[in-house]
Amino acid sequence: MTATTETAPVAPPAEPAAAKKTKKQQPKKVAGGAKAKKPSGPSASELIVKAVSSSKERSGVSLAALKKALAAGGYDVDKNNSRLKLALKALVTKGTLTQVKGSGASGSFKLNKKQLETKDKAAKKKPAAPKAKKTAAGAKKAPKSPKKPKKVSAAAKSPKKVKKLAKAAKSPKKPKAVKAKKVAKSPAKKATKPKTAKSPAKAKVAKPKAAKAKKPAPKK
């Protein structure tokens, strides 16, 4: 009997562990259900803007008329009544809707045409702005191409170096011309000296004539 009483209390502690596991798993299911409830379609503000823009009433659209239009589109108005009121107030503060009558969420509402016109103009101007940026980028890229002629200018500078080398080659020619002049002057001086030596040559020519005249005398 004592053995059975000691072993019996050991089994129950396993049950609270299982209960803890079930408690942890349950909140996960609830979180998954909350995520599934989020609407995947358009927001309440978008639906209100569509309903007001589609209406042809000049005096504006009342809250009751909005609810009818949204209910006809399949929107649950009863569950999302608070969201509709908050969306209406937010649209009025932003300026997308103008409140013609009443205050708060009650009354009648119209679309703010001025803001819509500005949005349309901004939407039309936005595509034009990227084109201007592209042209500006193209204009910046265009001047980059003339950088290549710099190499040509560097090549054009090389003839200057060739000219300098040609001038350097011409400069040694000048001393050669000077040397030629000096050489030409020296033979001229030598040519003047032999003039004095010509006088004895004439005397030598005169002597043989006298010898020839002496030979015929013995023949007689």
Curated annotation (Swiss-Prot):
CDD domains: H15. This is Histone H1B. PROSITE patterns: H15. Its main location: nucleus. Belongs to the histone H1/H5 family. One of its GO terms (molecular function) is structural constituent of chromatin. It comes from Xenopus laevis (African clawed frog). It is found in: Nucleus; Chromosome. The lineage of its organism: Eukaryota, Metazoa, Chordata, Craniata, Vertebrata.
